[in-house]
């Protein structure tokens, strides 16, 4: 306790030593004002006040300055000061702005707010293009709080999760800061170099706060919050918003500012509510405070997200630019709840420096030398927004106990508690961990892989694993083994694999595996074991067709250059046909029987689907992520796909040295896929495939190309870009040239939000088209229309589609129930 108190005093003293201009900002009732903008007049040198109303403005030269205090809802205050030496204390008291309608001339023919917003919308593109390029300094602080943490989560104790929380199991979960240099070039180039990074409780941590994550420009038609949210000044904003003029006031430069209330026309549209402040005659944004619910944004964990932006005008540059931004949010999911905020301060804009396309490569984020090693002296000197008492306390507590938490005695004590073997571990799995040496070993629950098929009967798999993490570059060694036993065929099968990851920059992996397993003829696994178990036992439809594979395989994958990856394998395979060994069902239909285990001849029993054979198999696959950008962390490279460009896959597969020459083959394949947003019109995706075989007339069925079918009326994926939902699983399998197309458009509420009653449900309309063509067979097509985002409150894992199929005329239709949560279970 004494040690922490001493540290607290030292921190406060260091604040005093390095604060240049500092002070406290209150209202007329002496209440602290957070998020006040403080800057030097006619410059972009500034800061904001923290939650407790304190601020620090770092200046190097004693001189005469005019300091501006600007806060929404309060009159702007200017104070001219002459500084002879630092530190200098300057407090401010702000009076509430008298916002009135007295000076507004009301036209009874049209809402005055509509007139203002029409002019702002008409000027949107002009204002968007005013800023072509700049360099600036950027500061960010991210904080996430958690409240009332449950003692257990799915039976697991959360004691180690409690560090830094109070007696109510509440407190700061994450606290981090960055100081950066950023460069921008219109329309969408943004590059950031992080000079300093700090994470509470991790002296070696690198913050994930970035300028690109909060690059919200409301002059664009939409704002990207995972989904595209429509701006109140979008070209088509009047289709989504109503507006009300709440009043006007004059800023410190004499500009008339209109306060406009932003009102959603429909409560569940992807739109904001709140206030936007528009400068009269210039029709630019002066400030905004806009909120959106998690339901509107279709972000299940989020309750409310609020964005606050403040702008300042420079007479020198004749520009309005953003000087501060705050993002506040609240969340709740699975019993966890809390809130957080993200504070961003932009300063020292430079519009004169030449910034061109040559200034930008694919790297959008980098770190300076020793960015995570800056000491408290550095932070106390250059941090533009003072820490609150809560944040100071979190840094002191977590930094002081970090050494203890990383020590061997502490980690061993935690492991001793968590590694205790309990009787329930026999059924639900067990994990043993050595945290100090960073390795773990264990096995999974045999219940998680319990399933049924007509070849093995009831069967289960026991998976064993070992993993050793090696260093800060995220190298690791992973070893896995599995044993599967089928009761009906009375056969034990086993596999083993070894994976070594060399680093997290190019992500090279070396993989070795081998053993004996059952494998679906279509190795894309078109039907999951769980769904096949249900369809077999309850409906006597054994759609899964499998064979016995003995194999040994070596593989390697790596990113060669940014956006270009290779994946190659060489394998020995011995394939053997399998037969049904059980006809068990829960509900026996005398008019229905199980089909055989031969996909091509489901009504022929007792004859092998193919002759036992063996071969060597070589695969070389490449992936081109065109336009891919990336973030460079000292220990990692994080790739950022560019939705403006597609991803291209090209592959070559060769079967050779087969026990029978007929099983040798060559195959070339390609795939092109892309997903991109169309603003308020939703999201469009496509997936195109093509391939051809050579010398493949009599190859094994498992080497054919199989378009993924579905005969169960159940879907499990979030989209249907790789499946024909009304096609038998092996009806179009081919060993010749083929072309496959999947197209899907999600309107994201564009149409259903306009339908009375349906617009209350927050559903999304989805349409799709699918086609497959191969030699000597009439082309096959499917067309679908469906509703997505079905569920209750935050849990929206359901989707329903109606599908019609055609092949030389109408073939049939089906209703598909999308149970997306099955992906999580499996």
Which sequence ranges carry the predicted segments?
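Structural motif
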Residues: 20-33
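A short, solvent-exposed loop/turn motif at the edges and junctions
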Residues: 40-42, 68-78
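Short, acidic Ser/Thr/Gly-rich low-complexity loop/linker segments typical of extracellular
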Residues: 44-54
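Structured extracytoplasmic
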Residues: 98-99, 103-257, 263-271, 334-451, ...
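Short loop/turn motifs that connect adjacent beta-strands in outer-membrane beta-barrel proteins
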Residues: 128-130, 421-424, 428-441, 454, ...
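Transmembrane beta-strand segments that form the barrel wall of outer-membrane beta-barrel proteins
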Residues: 262, 290-294, 439-452, 468, ...
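Residues that define the transmembrane beta-barrel architecture of outer-membrane proteins
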Residues: 305, 456-460, 490-494, 548-552, ...
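C-terminal outer-membrane beta-barrel translocator/porin domains of Gram-negative envelope proteins
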Residues: 509-530, 534-547, 607-608, 640, ...
